[in-house]
Swiss-Prot record:
Domain free text: The cysteine framework is XIV (C-C-C-C).
Name of protein: Conotoxin Am14.1
Propeptide, residue positions: 1-19, 52-61
Post-translational note: Mostly non-hydroxylated.
Tissue-level expression: Expressed by the venom duct.
Superkingdom field: Eukaryota
Organism: Conus amadis (Amadis cone)
Alphabetized UniProt keyword annotations: Cleavage on pair of basic residues, Disulfide bond, Ion channel impairing toxin, Secreted, Toxin
Disulphide bonds in the chain: none
Protein location: Secreted
Job description of the protein: Probable toxin that inhibits ion channels.
A GO CC annotation given for this chain: extracellular region
GO terms assigned for molecular function: ion channel regulator activity; toxin activity
Length: 61
């Protein structure tokens, strides 16, 4: 969940922003970036790198 701490003195708590569009955008961004993350060895947390390895997308041919 995306949250923003309000900085005005009269604010009480945290404002929560809707994520309808951000979830879709994040998915599209990861779809593009995951192959590069997996090649670099940094994608395992966010990407399904094992599936990409099984498809032989990372061969040196």
């Amino acid at each position: 969940m995306l949250s923003v701490q309000l900085i005005t003195p009269s604010s009480h708590g945290t404002a929560h922003l809707p994520r309808d569009d951000t979830d879709a955008a994040a998915g599209e961004i990861l779809e593009f970036l995951c192959p590069f993350f997996c090649i670099g060895g940094i994608g395992d947390e966010y990407c399904d790198c094992q599936e990409k390895r099984d498809l032989d997308l990372f061969t040196d041919q």
